[in-house]
């Protein structure tokens, strides 16, 4: 035959490699600044990376217990510059909620006892599985208007915590 069959169906699927090549070309041409290039790469990583890659691990989570004395609470506030602390019954796997450091500091400024961590200061915490991608966590944060979550494994044990800023770094 003189004529060979040519595929006339167009493939409009764009792959990550296609986008990456365009980004690299844009960076080399000076159209994309280094910071913009890095930001775009990070957006694509959110789909691939799972929660454990960005969370604070269980061993590094600082938390309060319901029976914790006031001096211990003050010491943790001074030593760890966190904006939120988990509140647990007796151990980390017995999560009750979390407290915002601002609320505790207001209590200190008003000479109120810190021993009465109760419903007015303890907030409900978002609990997520460790199998989610960072993109899925971002969606959960957006839909619940939260910026902090406890990460659990398939046995409902706490494996860490993650914040919005952990994802954005």
Regions found by a protein language model. Give the residues of each.
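Soluble cytosolic regulatory domains appended to membrane proteins
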Residues: 10-169
